[in-house]
Amino acid sequence: MRFFNMSRNNKNVIIDGHRMSCNGIKGSGITKTITVNPEPFSRVNLIGSIDVDITISDTPLIQVTADDNLVDLIEVSFFGDSVDIGFKENASFNTNKPMLVKISCPILSRIALSGSGDVTASNLNQENFEASIAGSGDITLDGSAKNIAFSINGSGDIDATHLKAENLEVTIAGSGDVDATATVSAHVRVSGSGNVKV
């Protein structure tokens, strides 16, 4: 059963498997996938430990996979041109199967990762692209973009060795690393033990 709670300005999609207490739920080991058909978006915000796989495609689509009794704990919310992915408030659980969100969208201008989840984005083709990490999660990118800006506050890493770019700007506060390419210019600011390889 799926519950859709949508207002005019804040469209919340609560993907619901079983309605139960959120305290210490153990994953069933049975995988379930829910499909969400969203409005167009270009920004992805991830909060928590969910892994996200993003592919550039003409048709926007979101698929959420998890233990069938934990899918209800994952929230997908739309705010303008952004989609937020995270957990319901006070959720407490132990997974048996991996939690994975697959996203297709025609344009991706920004990824913001807060937490320990990992994000992969493939086939980027942008004029401007931004990615930020607050936490220990990693971001892996490929494709092309004229101007890219990366920021890390924590221990997460950004691997953009397969993202062709002209101009690069990197800001690191912490121990995170960035591997990237830039054919025209690179501006780097590091506060902490993080490393940048261009």
What are these regions (language model features)?
Residues 1-198:
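Intrinsically disordered, low-complexity terminal regions
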